[in-house]
């Protein structure tokens, strides 16, 4: 594949994974220049964007590149101005990109500091009420791996600092013991490497890589749900590490009990240690994050502009810092000083229609479960008692009405049920709604509550 073909595929996948605002602001207009020596050089026309992409999106792009090209490639975003200083004799003409040798691929399986964002340390982590406990637990684990909490399970929404804490643990462990073998990976990458090891008959090398280490940091574990072989492999990896007193840190967007299609034996192991959750930052924490950012970047931004951002962007840290980056780029491109008015103008696309949060099936299960006194895990169970089966059908109905997920995907989130079960549930609830006005009001109230999540 040429660079252009590779990057088109990367952008297509990234568009599905990132918010519309993040994608259009930072990634949409980038261009893959070359892939060389395990590094992808990607061009961005705006300096702030290149810096932001390197800090916040390098990991997700690296995982996507692995999916597209089938081997490890580390993305590096540079500006078109920096391209002149890029020391290679290549031209920008698209050419065929070839897979590196096995030696090169193995060399990219680093166990050291290269895996971690240099910025993501404990010193740069802004502590507030929503993350104080996860921060303390992470520091305890980093100070004494496998002696404090093992495993440490961190969960919370997107962009709240889970990955920052995992990188901080990695940095701190290596500061204390430079010879420690530390792996940071995502469950998606773990799955891809596992599949590749089966395909290439390299299962022993895969197991050696993941089991002969001191610390395993694995992000977004929820993505192994419904992957039976991957779960089995991770189960044995977990056991091997835990029995040998090696530290395991896991992150997810939800607690273990809410991960559908997760084997009970894995779920119980995730609950062996300490489970901590990160919640969205309050106003004071948001202001502290912005102030720390402008101090680090040596920027001059009026307090009233920061106040405007902190008041308007409340969902997560990534969007908060993204808004600041967008403002800086907007000011630079227009050649105007930053004021509250310019800030409002720069962020109007984000703030005006902040868009209702995208509804997830987990949101629906949580609210329906609370209303009918059904545990979230029961939606995925095989139980058919009416007290569980009927709320499950209501949740399936609402999942089809309020989300864009396919029938098979909805069935998967309800214990791997067939798409015909979802169709039947939708038809039954639709019929009951027409016949029972009280029930109709009940479901409408549930729908309103879900939309307001």
Swiss-Prot record:
Compartments, record wording: Cytoplasm
One Pfam match: DnaA_N
Region named Domain II: 71-114
Chief site of localization: cytoplasm
Region (Domain III, AAA+ region): 115-331
Molecular function terms, GO-annotated: ATP binding; ATP hydrolysis activity; DNA replication origin binding; lipid binding
Gene Ontology BP terms: DNA replication initiation; regulation of DNA replication
UniProt: ATP binding residues: 159, 161-163
NCBIfam families per the UniProt record, alphabetical: DnaA (TIGR00362)
Name by which UniProt lists this protein: Chromosomal replication initiator protein DnaA
Organism: Staphylococcus aureus (strain bovine RF122 / ET3-1)
GN (gene name): dnaA
């Amino acid at each position: 594949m040429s660079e252009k073909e590779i990057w088109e595929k990367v952008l297509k996948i990234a568009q599905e994974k990132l918010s519309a605002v993040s994608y259009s602001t930072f990634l949409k207009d980038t261009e893959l220049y070359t892939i060389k020596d395990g590094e992808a050089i990607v061009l961005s026309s705006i300096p702030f964007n290149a810096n932001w992409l390197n800090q916040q999106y390098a990991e997700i792009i690296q995982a996507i590149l692995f999916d597209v090209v089938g081997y490890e490639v580390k993305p590096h975003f540079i500006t078109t101005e920096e391209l002149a200083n890029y020391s290679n004799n290549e031209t920008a003409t698209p050419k065929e990109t070839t897979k590196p040798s096995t030696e090169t691929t193995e060399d990219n399986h680093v166990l050291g500091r290269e895996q971690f964002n240099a910025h993501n340390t404990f010193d740069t982590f802004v502590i507030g009420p929503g993350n104080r406990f996860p921060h303390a637990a992470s520091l305890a684990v980093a100070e004494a791996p496998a002696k404090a909490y093992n495993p440490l399970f961190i969960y919370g929404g997107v962009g709240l600092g889970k990955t920052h804490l995992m990188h901080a643990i990695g940095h701190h462990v290596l500061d204390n013991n430079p010879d420690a073998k530390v792996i940071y990976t995502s469950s998606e990458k773990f799955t891809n490497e596992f599949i590749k090891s089966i395909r290439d008959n390299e299962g022993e090398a895969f197991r050696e890589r993941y089991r002969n280490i001191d610390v395993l940091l694995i992000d977004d574990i929820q993505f192994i749900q419904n992957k039976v072989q991957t779960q089995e492999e991770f189960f044995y990896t977990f056991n091997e590490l835990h029995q040998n007193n090696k530290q395991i840190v896991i992150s997810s967007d939800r607690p273990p009990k809410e991960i559908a299609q997760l084997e009970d034996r894995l779920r119980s192991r995730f609950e062996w240690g300490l489970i901590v959750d990160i919640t969205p930052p309050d106003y004071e924490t948001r202001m502290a994050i912005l102030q720390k950012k402008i101090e680090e970047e040596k920027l001059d931004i009026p307090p009233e502009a920061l106040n405007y951002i902190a008041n308007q962007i409340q969902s997560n840290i990534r969007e908060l810092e993204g808004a600041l980056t967008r403002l800086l780029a907007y000011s630079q491109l227009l050649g105007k000083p930053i004021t509250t008015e310019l800030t409002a103008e720069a962020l109007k696309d984000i703030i005006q229609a902040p868009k209702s949060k995208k509804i997830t099936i987990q949101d629906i299960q949580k609210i329906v479960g609370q209303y009918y006194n059904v545990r979230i895990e029961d939606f995925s169970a095989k139980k058919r008692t009416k007290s569980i089966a009927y709320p499950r059908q209501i949740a399936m109905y609402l999942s089809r009405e309020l989300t864009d997920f396919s029938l098979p995907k909805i069935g998967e989130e309800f214990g791997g049920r067939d798409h015909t079960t979802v169709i039947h549930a939708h038809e039954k609830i639709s019929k009951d709604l027409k016949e029972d006005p009280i029930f109709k009001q009940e479901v409408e109230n549930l729908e309103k509550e879900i939309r307001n999540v």
